């Protein structure tokens, strides 16, 4: 999938339907209207919550990952930046690792600590 705003919003709808808000794999909030916006936030009970999002490659391209839909996730921009192009990474106090799904060519992100 070519990653651009149009395709990203279609991918959001495939993943979350008509929902305006969702959480990424780390639990960070995303707002559909915040695609690609580093400064997008909402006020929730008087607290500003950053919820811009973009597309994350589960298996980074540097490790052989592609833009196939099975290798993509919607993630909060902060989550994506923390994960970077690594297959083992920390976000806060959580350690994650990209693992191959047994019997397939697909990968997933697993919290290991």
Language-model features, listed with the residues they occupy:
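Solvent-exposed, non-transmembrane amphipathic alpha-helical segments
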Residues: 27-31, 75-78, 92-99
């Amino acid at each position: 999938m070519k990653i651009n705003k149009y395709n990203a919003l279609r991918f959001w709808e495939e993943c979350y339907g008509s929902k305006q808000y969702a959480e990424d794999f780390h639990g960070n909030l995303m707002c559909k209207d915040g695609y690609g916006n580093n400064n997008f936030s909402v006020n929730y009970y008087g607290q500003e919550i950053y919820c811009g999002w973009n597309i994350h490659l589960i298996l980074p391209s540097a490790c052989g990952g592609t833009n196939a839909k099975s290798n993509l996730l919607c993630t909060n921009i902060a989550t994506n930046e923390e994960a970077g192009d690594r297959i083992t990474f920390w976000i806060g106090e959580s350690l994650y690792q990209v693992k191959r799904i047994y019997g397939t060519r697909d990968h997933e992100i697993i919290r290991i600590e």
